[in-house]
């Protein structure tokens, strides 16, 4: 399962990328370990769930089609398509913390209280 952390905009790293940037105004996205987002997409399995979470861990996107993800300033993790993982929704109160997905009941209760 793949986990690309802290994906941000970066400069082209090859002559080919530079030419694509000049010609088509491509924005390059790289994970914190230097992996190219566009090249890594082919490594995601089609039968898994992909989730995008922000720097504070909030899950902001859940789905299977990796091409539908715009991960700028976020992280992408791939998880098995099992019942427990299908319960995770976005937007909502799900967070990725300490290498697991957790539901923040306190934040939900505070939001409900504030809405009264």
Residue ranges and their predicted role:
Residues 54, 61-116:
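Negatively charged, Asp/Glu-rich surface segments that serve as flexible interaction/assembly modules
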Residues 1-27, 32-35, 41-43, 68-71, ...:
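A preference for well-ordered globular domain cores
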Residues 34-64:
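Short, contiguous, helix-prone interaction/anchoring segments in small proteins
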């Amino acid at each position: 399962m793949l986990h690309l952390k802290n994906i941000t905009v970066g400069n082209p790293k090859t002559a080919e990328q530079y030419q694509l940037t000049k010609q088509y105004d491509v924005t390059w996205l790289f994970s914190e370990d230097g992996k190219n987002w566009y090249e890594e997409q082919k490594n995601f399995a089609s039968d898994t769930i992909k989730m995008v979470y922000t720097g504070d861990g909030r899950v902001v996107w859940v789905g299977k089609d990796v091409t539908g993800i715009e991960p700028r300033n976020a992280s992408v993790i791939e998880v098995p398509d099992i019942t427990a993982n299908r319960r995770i929704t976005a937007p909502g109160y799900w967070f990725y913390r300490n290498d697991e997905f957790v539901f923040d009941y306190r934040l939900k209760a505070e939001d409900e209280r504030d809405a009264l």
